[in-house]
Structures are given as C-alpha cells and as structure tokens.
Amino acid sequence: MSFPDSKTHQNLKAAFAGESQANRRYTWMAQVAEKEGLPEVAALFKHSADGETGHALKHLMFLAAQAGDPATGMPLGDSLTNLKSAVAGETYEYTDMYPEFARLAREEGYGEIAAWFETLAKVERFHAGRFQDALTKLQSGTMAAPDADIAKHI
C-alpha cells in the first residue's frame, strides 16, 4: 500500500492538525491567564504549547518525507520547494477557501464572521505575493538579506 493511501498517513495528518491546534489553543489560554494575573498558569500553558509544537513538527517531518505538504499535497524539502508549496497554499486560501467561507457565513447570517473571512482572504493574498516574490528572487539568484518587514505579516 502506498503511504498516501494508508491509514497511517491519515493518522499523521490528523495528529499534525490536532497538535498544531493545541499549540494555538494553549497560546491563547496563556494570554487569558496573563490578563487574569495568573503567571504560573500562563507559564504552564506556554510550556505545553511549546511541547505541542514539537509534536506537530515531528509529525510534519514524517509527512514531508513520505507524502509532502499535508495542506497542499506538494513536496516539501529545501526552501525553493517549500516556497512553491507556500504559494500554492496561500493562493488556495485567498482564491477559494476564504471567499467560500465568507459566502457561506454571510448566507447563514454571520456577517461579522464573513467580514473576517474576507479580511483573511486579503491577508492571504498578500502572503502569497510575498512568498512568490521570494520564490522568484531565489530562482533568479537575486535573493538579498531577509526583509525585516516580512515578520510583521506572518
């Protein structure tokens, strides 16, 4: 059985998604605890979030080696390859995913959520452009020192 057709592949994708989401949830919970003046609880959540990131990265390592990017299905590896996958992922998000999410949210009467999805589509388009610019520069050999402004938008 090929790896992409295996239950192990599906389990790794689910585990990667779950651990990644746990990281974000615990990061948010740490912020709540900080606002509540509970630094020990915040530290516990931050430490746990870091652990979940480690788990997710190991899952991604297996996925990358066996089946590529779990979001795009494209290969992962060196920066050139990773940029191609990032462009594809961000492009899908701004051309298909978020516009459809916004349409459905608006149709169901959730205008604020629809507006949020529309905003995200614009941000993802910006991300795709930044990744595409980096890809073009890397392919042409004109990649310069990292742009400090990039971190503001990631």
Show the residue positions of the predicted features.
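Non-heme di-metal
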Residues: 1-154
